């Protein structure tokens, strides 16, 4: 590694920068999924440096270069959330580089994009939920699995990553109520749960019976593919199953995704009379203000001032 005298510059050649990114990722105390997200984000940044010949002058990169990368991202038809995610990964990298006295933080003052207010995905109506479930063919084990999966997510607000981590033994009884213990987003342990109502449990029991005798360590939802038969399902597979069910029910809308079932569960719980505390507990929001967004959106619709206009 060469330095250039008084300046804090370090002439970093591309292989070395990639090595630094690898070291940065290993040094982060974050969940594996977050590490993968950072990795993808930073690989895109490294690729852009090569494409714009900036990899040839890594030692002299400045804040303007980061702003140029941000402008590039904004031309790629990416969502504001994705752009902010990419910028956050770069900020974390340069903050780490500065803390290690390797390179100054040239991202200081660079902001992500402005995120839209409210929640990001549309929610479904009860009629739409019933139609999507009706379209799932339950004549096979795979169909029973998909039905139980869709139904569970719509009734509990589980995230796809939370579903992917669940095991058969995570179904337990608390005070006489069936619950499913889960490892939440960004958590290292299964320290929270969702209630399993009779409506949530019934399809789940039917599906589990088709799999025969299962150990407590068996995945709650298992893959039926030749390559991963019997293994736990990935978040990608879960998302695909939900999306397929929605499309078959005539809801081919990019705004409707597996995460829409989470928004749907929270919204329907509030419509059904859940308090802020109850909805927050089910959604496992650390900040009640996140849950309040759902209340505000529903109030805005039901009590909109536009309805008072008459001429």
Predicted regions and their residues:
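Conserved catalytic core of the tyrosine transesterase superfamily
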Residues: 1-311
